[in-house]
Amino acid sequence: MNQADRALQASQARVYNFSAGPAVLPTEVLEQAREEMLSWQGSGMSVMEMSHRGREFESIMAQAFADLRELLAVPDNYEILFLQGGAIAENAIVPLNLMRRLSLDAPKADYVVTGTWSVKSQQEARKYGEVNIAASSEAERFHRIPDVSAWKLSDDAAYVHLCTNETIVGVEYQETPDIGQAHGRVVVADVSSHILSRPVDWNGYAVLYGGAQKNIGPAGLTIVIARKDLLGHAHPLCPSAFNWRLVAENGSMYNTPPTYAIYVAGLVFQWIKRQGGVEALETRNIVKAKMLYDFIDASGFYRNDIHPSCRSRMNVPFFLNDESRNEAFLAQARAQGLVQLKGHKSVGGMRASIYNAMPLEGVEALVDFMREFERTAA
């Protein structure tokens, strides 16, 4: 192999990407997107060039809707919306669509605060009405989720908001809180970083939303799944493009949708179906997370501070007991093809995001590296 061939091979090498988002995509999906880049299914056009109202893209959109509904077993009385703006925008869009549902004069919502993203959600919601913090684990540095029995929920709240997987601190609800439809409450959840990693109990949730760039596809697409009877309560000042009822009535084409992001998300949905569906991925995700947490817990060199009852399967933060070795850890990991392991700046340490598309081999490679780094650092 000559130098040019080696350079070409190196440029084509794939690393194990542990980024929290935008994040790893299935190799099969990337290969299919590459094959169809110049001409989607013989159309002579890239998906990026298509009119969103042309029959080619309409078929892509319809298939994506159908596959997502099938994968999550979304009931018929829920609407699936493809939007833009990410979960950050939904922090405003949710209260603009729901907070006046029970009272036009005194809009109110309950928020459960379990990490950085739910902090941001409640801060934004305060612009549109009263926010009651029903529970918070901030005093415990977000190392656990408050017990549901201690939540102080309001009788007059239009909805209860949760972030069911906190990407930064690494906590995840392992069970659906029993506060939803059976109790007459509307529960809204930000599921950005673990959507499609486990089945959904629709008795527990009225609205799910999330950015696609963590566990579905590229940045640019936001997914909202909302019970149909909740559409139509938007604030008069809610932008039309973010009014869920208008978006639903226009088939998520009130404005030009993020066409290529929807196309790639659709490829991911089909990939998940080939893997055996969400249930099969959940089993795989449990194995991956257990492997990494078990190694960390058995080590005297690394630690994870999250209570075992609510550790995230998707985002695993960990710390070196000797933080002076952090930069060496990251540099040596990168040399081994293990990238994007630096923890969020607000937390520090390391973080391995092991979403659906991260293969078991990637977690095995990370554990092997961590074991060797610990050995040589001793």
From Swiss-Prot:
- Listed GO MF terms: O-phospho-L-serine:2-oxoglutarate aminotransferase activity; pyridoxal phosphate binding
The note describing how and how many cofactors are bound reads: Binds 1 pyridoxal phosphate per subunit.
Protein name per UniProt: Phosphoserine aminotransferase
Enumerate the residues binding L-glutamate.
R53
Describe, as the record does, how this protein assembles with itself and its partners.
Homodimer.
Concerning Pfam families, the annotation shows: Aminotran_5
Annotated GO biological processes are: L-serine biosynthetic process; pyridoxine biosynthetic process
Name the cofactor(s) required for activity, per the record. Answer: pyridoxal 5'-phosphate
| Main function | Catalyzes the reversible conversion of 3-phosphohydroxypyruvate to phosphoserine and of 3-hydroxy-2-oxo-4-phosphonooxybutanoate to phosphohydroxythreonine.
> In terms of one coarse class, where is the protein primarily found?
cytoplasm
Which parts of the sequence bind pyridoxal 5'-phosphate?
W117, T167, D190, Q213, N255, T256
Q: What catalytic activity is recorded?
A: O-phospho-L-serine + 2-oxoglutarate = 3-phosphooxypyruvate + L-glutamate; 4-(phosphooxy)-L-threonine + 2-oxoglutarate = (R)-3-hydroxy-2-oxo-4-phosphooxybutanoate + L-glutamate
Q: What is its EC number?
A: 2.6.1.52
Q: Which GO terms describe its cellular component?
A: cytoplasm
Give the pathway listed in the UniProt entry for this protein. Answer: Amino-acid biosynthesis; L-serine biosynthesis; L-serine from 3-phospho-D-glycerate: step 2/3; Cofactor biosynthesis; pyridoxine 5'-phosphate biosynthesis; pyridoxine 5'-phosphate from D-erythrose 4-phosphate: step 3/5
State where the protein is found.
Cytoplasm
The entry assigns this protein to a family as follows:
Belongs to the class-V pyridoxal-phosphate-dependent aminotransferase family. SerC subfamily.
Q: Please, which domain of life does this record's source organism belong to?
A: Bacteria
Q: Which residues carry this modification: N6-(pyridoxal phosphate)lysine?
A: K214
Its keywords, alphabetically, are: Amino-acid biosynthesis, Aminotransferase, Cytoplasm, Pyridoxal phosphate, Pyridoxine biosynthesis, Serine biosynthesis, Transferase
Q: Under which main EC class is this enzyme filed?
A: transferase
